[in-house]
Structures are given as C-alpha cells and as structure tokens.
Regions:
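Terminal C-lobe "cap" of eukaryotic-type protein kinase domains
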Residues: 293-295, 301-318
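Activation-segment/catalytic-loop signature of the eukaryotic protein kinase fold
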Residues: 107
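Catalytic-loop of the protein kinase fold
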Residues: 156-180
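AlphaC helix of the eukaryotic protein kinase fold
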Residues: 78-95
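Regulatory extensions appended to serine/threonine kinase catalytic cores
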Residues: 315-468
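Conserved short submotifs of the Hanks-type protein kinase catalytic core
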Residues: 111-125
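ATP-binding glycine-rich loop module of kinase domains
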Residues: 61-83
Length: 607
C-alpha cells in the first residue's frame, strides 16, 4: 500500500490502543510491563505510566524517601540519533534552575535504553484541565501569562559564566504545563526541544566568546521542532533558534486556553479580542500571533515589558454567561465511557489549490504528524477547523457531523451523544468553536465526520493468501432507543451526498446493497471499513430508533459482516446516517465580534 492510500484515515494523534493490531497491542503491553518491572527492581514503588509521545514513554514512581520521581524512556525502535535526543534533553534540563521547572536528577543508559530521571511535576496538564473546564477565565489567563513571562525572562538571562547563553524551551503548549490545584504550583515540563539560542530577541548572534562567533555557522539552525499546532512561523520554517520561539509558544498557549481550542490556528476567525479578556491583554496576544513579523516582535516586547503591570488589574471571577450550543447534542442514558476516535472524509476541498507540494522524506516525528494530519497545504482557519474536530474526539462522545458550505451560508447537520454530563459546558465551548471556525471558511464544499468508540472496533487478520482469519464471525454492536414515529418527518440517508472522492476502497456490490437495505430502517450510525494489507478494521456505531424493526436490523447487520469478509481491496470507505434531517443554517463570518472583559467588574458583581 502506498502511504497516500491510507493517508485519508484521520484519527486523533494519540492513536487509541484499541486500534493497534493484536500483535502490536501485546508487544505494547509487554514493553510497559518490562519498564514497570525494571523501575520496581530499582527500588521505586507505585510505578505507573503517566504519558507517551512520538519519542517515548513517561512513568512515575516514589523513591524510598517518599519523593515522587518521573522516568522518561526513549523508544528503542527509533534511530540512534533520535534516541540520543533524550540525553540532550537531560543536559538542557540540568542547566535550568527555576521553581517552575522540575529538577533534573540523573540520566542512565541500560543497553540501548536511555532513561531520564527527574522530579515529578504534581497535578494535571492544562490541556486536560481545558478539556474538562472549557474556556479559561480572564483572571486565570492573566495569572498564567505573568508566570510564563517570568520563566521566559529567566531563560533569556541564563549565562555560561559571565557570557550570555539564553535557553529556548521550544515546545511551550498547554499539555507541557502542569498545574497542581492544591498548591497553586505551575511546572513547565518536556524539555525535549530545548536548545541554546543562536540569536537573541533582536536577531543578533549569541556567542559565549569571540571565537564562537568566528566559527559559528550563521546559516544553519540548531532548532528542534516543537508541536506543530503551537509553534510560530520562524520555528516551523527552520529559522535559527531564538527566545522569540518561546514568546510564540506562550502566545499560542494563552490563546488556546482562553478560547478552548487545541491549537493556535483559529486566531483570524476567533481573535483574542472576542474572548472576554481585558482589552490590553487581548490585543497583545493577537499581536503576538500576527502573520507580520514586526507586529509579532513588537507585541512580544510589549508583553515581556508590561506583563507585571497588566497583571495588577482587578479581575474578579464573574458569573459565566449561559452559553447555548450552536448545534444540539444529547446526554447518554448509558454509563459506559467510549474511547472516542474521529474519522473524517471529504477534506480535499479544504486544501489550497495552489499548494500541491509533498515532502516524501519526512524524518521528524512532529513533521510526520503534520503531513499525516492533512495540514501541510491547508490555510490556518482550515487547520483550526480540523483541529477542533480532533478536539471533539477528546470527549466521550459518539455520533456524526456534516458541514456543507454554499454561497453565503453554512449548513450543519448533526447527531451527537455525550457520555458525561459534567463535561457539558466544556463540550459546548468545543462544538461552538467548530461552528465558528467553519463559518470562517470560504471554500465551497462538504465535510463529514463520524465519532465512534474504538473499543467496539472489530479487527480481522488476513492469512498469507489475503483471506480473513476468524473462528466465529464477530457481530456489529448496536443500541436501541425507541423514538416516536411522529418525530421522523425527514429521514436522513446513507447516500445523501453521493460518492466520496477521498475514499479509495472498492466495496463489493453486496455490501453496498446491504447498506441500502439498512437505510430503509430508522436508525443512526456509521460504519467504516479500513482495509490494510495484513488486516481489516471495522469501526462502527449504531443506534436503532425503531424497536419494532430490531429482528430485521440485527439480520442485516449480521449479513453485512458476512459480506464484509469478501473485501479484497485496500483502502478506506465509510457510510454515515444521521437520525433525521435537522439542518442548522449559519451565516459565514470571517471574524467574530470583539467582546472584552468589562471595565467595571464591581458593578456587574453588585447587580
């Protein structure tokens, strides 16, 4: 299979363990158990996995004095040059002495395996808190802005002896900032992209001595790639490392948390000035996210200089206005928490027609992710829209969405079921962002996505001849919820929008005929066939809305599985059916209106 064929299958970046093949999932579990055993033998207790990324895994444990430690393991499957980065990270972390940065303890190498040991930052990362709470208040954003600005000052003022040697973190984003509510302590973690700055904030070369300046290659960069959803333009385009990189990371972080997004790209459509922040801070954040370098730098200088004064503003927590969701969703009556994954199709039109370049030799894990996730030739608003769809999959939600852009309007059809009522406010923020970003897209076209529970995914392995192996054919799972017939005036169809140009999998005619028969029964759901050379994954979510048809529905689902095993082609194809047509229409809107934190909050509190 060439890489292009599978590229359209777009799932949230931390792939669910339920989507790994049986062999890979087993290897994954064995490897985690080996790490836990190794750390337990070294005398640590309560060892647990607390995170994983492109480069490795992170464990936590308690030492014999009761102190919490963190252990970062590099993935041994990576190239040696990439594994060596963990040692570089250990060195950079050892250079930073700041109360907001976890202390470096040691770096060990056991055979090929590097292990970085450091103090544990207690609490929860801000991305997780943002998913639970939605938009951060003005007071929280202001307090965070001041703390991050103070860390940046410390990094800029780092010296080697008496010579200036500024440090760049290179990957400031919400998930790399850990907050402990009990102690009100903030920690900046993950120094894997950290380097010594090559140029200062003014763009002048940094050299510890005259000889360094003479020998420095001023055309190459030592910069590492941070998270492509948060880094600024200079870092993204391979510019020389500079303290400006971290200004950009801070601006992206403040913007993402204030707006309840998981990236920086939405700022043209949902500017900081629309997020109920104090006017001065909102304008500074928008300036720092500007496409114009001079504007960015001048806003960054203002931020660094004036943040302590700005932070003195009186910003009491005001009662949050009741925000209604722009599109409806329901809470599930079932207790189970789905492990949500999103599949989206028909993204082709979101790309910019004049950019067809493709980097085939992608050796950086972050860049690889950038290309896989379809971002390399889409505009910023389109990137933000796709990232907002990914953010929806961070909630325990199942269902489907369809966005149709025509002339001056956006039409949205949806069916969403959230499995946790405590997340209602935050999910409303997430879904409203998706709609506002969609209102800012000018291209005309159609975009659809399904959200399903990865735990229900059926996996069938192929034998040497390509035929599927199974003892008993698995069954497609479904729920039943009886809806009054009078509620169904305009049924929605699987075949509503014709053939999807993005999908390449040729399905047998009998599979399509079976879907056609299912279409006659009132239900909602999706089925996605992801056929790989060695196996097939069948992702699905079904909810029958007419209980009287259950025997027929069950019979057709069983038939569908029998026909699915005759698929020989490789690729992806899917069908989605919403419960009924309930189209919401929105005007297009290139930029949301200004909304600032009130000048006189006392008056509002007294009302």
């Amino acid at each position: 299979v060439n890489s292009k064929q599978i590229r359209n299958f777009y799932i949230n970046e931390e792939q669910s363990v339920y989507l790994l093949s049986h062999h890979d999932a087993k290897k994954h579990r064995q490897w985690l158990n080996i790490c836990i055993k190794q750390l337990t033998l070294l005398g640590y207790s309560d060892v647990e996995l607390i995170g994983s990324g492109a480069f490795g895994f992170v464990f936590a444990g308690i030492d014999d004095e009761g102190m919490p430690w963190v252990f970062k393991f590099s993935r041994i499957t990576l190239a040696q040059s990439v594994r060596d980065r963990l040692e570089d990270e250990a060195y950079m972390l050892s250079q930073v002495h700041n109360p907001l940065v976890p202390k470096f303890y040691a770096f060990e190498r056991i055979k090929k395996q590097g292990i970085l040991m450091m103090e544990r930052a207690l609490g929860e990362d801000l991305e997780k808190i943002s998913i639970k709470q939605g938009r951060f208040s003005a007071a929280k954003i202001m307090a965070l802005a001041l703390k991050l600005r103070n860390v940046l000052i410390d990094l800029r003022e780092h010296k080697n002896g008496i010579s200036p040697q500024p440090i760049v973190h290179g990957d400031i984003k919400p998930s790399n900032i850990v907050y402990d509510e009990q102690t009100n302590k903030l920690s900046l973690v993950d120094w894997g992209s950290s380097v010594y700055a090559q140029i200062d904030a003014e763009g002048n070369p940094v050299a510890s001595n005259f000889m360094d300046l003479m020998s420095a290659d001023i055309s190459t960069t030592n910069a590492r790639m941070g998270d492509v959803y948060f880094i600024g333009d200079e870092q993204m385009s391979g510019g020389q490392s500079s303290p400006r990189f971290d200004e950009q990371g801070v601006a992206s972080t403040l913007y993402a948390l204030a707006s309840a997004q998981s990236c920086r790209f939405g700022a043209a459509v949902i500017p900081a000035t629309s997020l109920n922040l104090p006017m001065e801070l909102a304008r500074v954040i928008d300036g720092m996210l500007s496409k114009n370098k001079a504007t960015r730098d001048s806003a960054g200088d203002y931020f660094m200089r004036n943040m302590p004064t700005m932070a003195k503003a009186y910003l009491p927590e005001l009662p949050r206005k009741l925000i209604r969701p722009y599109i409806p969703y329901w809470f599930s009556e079932f207790d189970e928490h789905p492990d949500t994954v999103v599949y989206s199709s028909r993204k082709q039109f979101l790309r910019q027609a004049d950019h067809n370049q493709q980097l085939l030799d992608v050796n950086d894990a972050q860049l690889d992710r950038y290309y896989k996730e379809f971002l390399f030739d889409t505009g910023d608003t389109e990137k933000a829209f796709l990232a907002s769809i990914s953010r929806l999959a961070k909630y325990p939600v199942v269902g489907g969405l369809s966005f149709h852009w025509k002339e001056n309007s956006l039409f949205v059809e949806s069916s969403l079921i959230l499995h946790d009522e405590t997340l209602g406010t935050a999910f409303t923020d997430a879904i409203n962002n998706t709609v506002m970003l969609a209102q800012g897209i000018e291209q005309k076209g159609l975009f659809k996505c399904c959200l399903f529970d990865a735990r229900k995914t059926i996996q069938l392995e192929r034998d040497g001849t390509g035929a599927f192996k199974f003892e008993h054919l698995p069954e497609l799972d479904y729920e039943v919820m009886d809806v009054q017939a009078s509620d169904v005036t305009r049924p929605h169809s699987y075949f509503e929008d014709g053939k999807d140009p993005d999908e390449q999998l040729q399905l047998p005619k009998k599979v399509i005929k079976c879907v056609f028969e299912l279409n006659q029964i009132h239900h909602t759901g999706c089925i996605i066939f992801e056929a790989l050379p060695d196996r097939m994954k069948i992702h699905h979510y079904y909810r029958l809305l007419d209980a009287s048809k259950e025997p027929e529905f069950k019979r057709l689902l069983s038939k569908l599985m029998q026909y699915a095993v005759s698929i020989t082609d490789v690729g992806v194809a899917g069908f989605m059916k919403l419960p009924y047509k309930n189209t919401r229409e929105f005007d297009l809107c290139a930029k949301q209106a200004d909304e600032f934190y009130p000048r006189d909050p006392k008056r509002i509190l007294m009302e």
